[in-house]
């Protein structure tokens, strides 16, 4: 089936105007991208260095949300927003949608609904760095956002593979500050370089996604400060994550435990809840907001000058 050319459009890619063409092409003319951030990690860990299109489809179908998207596209009778492709037909944005249409086409090869797909084709001279930044604008900042870990993976690739600066990424995504980009990089590196080795074969993208908020809070929390640079603390926290011994909301309470030697020792041996129990035993006010407020008030009164206390007594009378 011959492709049909439509209109041209100017698309802003990494701050530059790029003239793209809108076309309708046979579904078989497109190739999935093995560098797709949603499947990149699983593909690397599989050891498959030359995946076939069927291999890539399998990885994509295993992603959460795939079945729901396939149902939506099937009921709609196709897709309306064009997928973005390179000049040679390799998919830049829309790998999951291409997989859905390809799968439906295999099931109903005679149906005209699944024979073609709308595309927006980039010219040959667009550099890969600009394409990677375009994906960040779509999926890190745009309405069709990837899961948090996939977004972090894309940010990490922009810095380490394409040599983009945190400032450039912040400008392109618009919803992240330079500091937030740096924190994202720190959290990603911690998960990849310290948590994954501790977890071994148990890690996959679902695991890493479930621990993302923990890692981000760990690198953001100001109270952790210099404690965060202690190798033993980093190792202990990685162990807590791999053994599911700390919840996301509990990371914020970690500094209090690390300031107590006994609680820290229990933390490393038995997990967060056991360590927090040590603190509660030493200080019962931890479990009661009223008692904590009374404790603070008592401390403030103890620091007041005698004349101020006498004035208070006189006023009460």
Language model features: what each stretch is:
Residues 51-55, 68, 154, 180, ...:
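Exposed alpha-helical structural elements
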Residues 53, 57, 113-196:
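Amphipathic, charge-rich alpha-helical segments that serve as recognition/docking helices
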Residues 41-44, 72-75, 124-128, 137-140, ...:
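Short hydrophobic/aromatic-rich motifs at helix boundaries and adjacent loops
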Residues 2-113:
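Short, charged/polar connector segments at secondary-structure boundaries
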